[in-house]
């Protein structure tokens, strides 16, 4: 993994990720206390606290702090983003969707609690995420409202759900164009990654032009993230991924490597990340975490 290059000299991404992940894990654990009915809270916590990179909340915190905000201002939203991401994983793993048995190295939610409880756990995490953002202390209400609107767009038919629908409709087809693939992933994966970054900026009180700049950064890393995901589905093992490998090929899904080959896919991901990093140059060293996170996305192994 690249932890520093010409863009981030002297900045240790490994140390930053470890510190931020520890903070996020503690906040997530405190965000969701088990009460009645016990089963649903246990199911929610099972997937929410199952580990993972915590990339989305960390992006939110990094963007907020880069623009002069504090971690406290963004923490509720950071946790909410992970709740929404976890919901999408629970539902994505269901037999009606991707039908997966393994997630983050553990049995998927429906394998432990059954399909009915898994669906409800995802629903509950989604609704609680919006409540949790709304309960953020010491942040102006108009900023929270902007974040809630963007979250709704990112997770609904304009975003994640819309991308998933086109993904399902494209399964088994051999004539899927790269434009369709881009639509799927800018909505299914990229929309939530984008709001991670823009929400952090908004919470810090960013100007509209700063939010727009960070939106472009996030769009680039979001697409790069998915290209790398497609490559890893072919090249990595289930142990490395923490989930079943080769699922795209098995489901006859069109991927970037199937259209471009692995070498061109890697080059495209590198290009997108370079553009993302270049867009942050006005922020100097304050942007080191976001620059290094972009590098991490294209160099990760899972």
Swiss-Prot record:
It comes from the Bacteria. Changing residue 87 to Y: Can only generate C15-farnesyl pyrophosphate (FPP) as the final product. One of its GO terms (cellular component) is cytoplasm. InterPro entries: GGPPSyn_CRT-like (IPR054848), Isoprenoid_synthase_dom_sf (IPR008949), Polyprenyl_synt (IPR000092), Polyprenyl_synt_CS (IPR033749), Prenyl_diphosphate_synthase (IPR053378). Mg(2+) 2 binds at residues 92, 98. It catalyses: isopentenyl diphosphate + dimethylallyl diphosphate = (2E)-geranyl diphosphate + diphosphate; isopentenyl diphosphate + (2E)-geranyl diphosphate = (2E,6E)-farnesyl diphosphate + diphosphate; isopentenyl diphosphate + (2E,6E)-farnesyl diphosphate = (2E,6E,10E)-geranylgeranyl diphosphate + diphosphate. Homodimer. This is Geranylgeranyl pyrophosphate synthase. It comes from Picosynechococcus sp. (strain ATCC 27264 / PCC 7002 / PR-6) (Agmenellum quadruplicatum). The gene is crtE.
């Amino acid at each position: 993994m690249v932890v520093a290059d010409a863009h981030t000299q002297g900045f240790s991404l490994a140390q930053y990720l470890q510190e931020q992940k520890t903070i996020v894990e503690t906040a997530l654990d405190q965000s969701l206390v088990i009460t009645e009915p016990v089963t649903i809270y246990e199911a929610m916590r099972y997937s929410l606290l199952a580990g993972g990179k915590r990339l989305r909340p960390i992006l939110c915190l990094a963007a907020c702090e880069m623009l002069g905000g504090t971690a406290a201002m963004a923490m509720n939203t950071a946790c909410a983003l992970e709740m929404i991401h976890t919901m999408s994983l629970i539902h994505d793993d269901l037999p009606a969707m991707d039908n997966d048995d393994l997630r983050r190295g553990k049995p998927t939610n429906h394998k432990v609690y059954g399909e009915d409880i898994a669906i409800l756990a995802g629903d509950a995490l989604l609704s609680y995420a919006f409540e949790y953002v709304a309960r953020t202390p010491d942040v102006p209400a108009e900023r929270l409202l902007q974040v809630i609107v963007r979250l709704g767009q990112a997770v609904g038919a304009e975003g994640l759900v819309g991308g998933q629908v086109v993904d399902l409709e494209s399964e088994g087809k051999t004539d899927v164009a790269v434009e369709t693939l881009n639509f799927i992933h800018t909505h299914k994966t990229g929309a939530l990654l984008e709001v991670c970054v823009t929400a952090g900026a908004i919470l810090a009180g960013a100007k509209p032009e700063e939010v727009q700049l960070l939106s472009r950064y996030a769009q680039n890393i979001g697409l790069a993230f998915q290209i790398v995901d497609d490559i890893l589905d072919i090249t990595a093992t289930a142990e490395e991924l923490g989930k079943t490998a080769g699922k795209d090929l098995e489901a006859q899904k069109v991927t970037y490597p199937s259209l471009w080959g692995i070498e061109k896919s890697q080059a495209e991901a590198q290009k997108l990340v370079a553009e993302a990093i270049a867009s942050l140059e006005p922020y100097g060293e304050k942007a080191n975490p976001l620059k290094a996170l972009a590098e991490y996305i294209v160099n990760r192994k899972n």
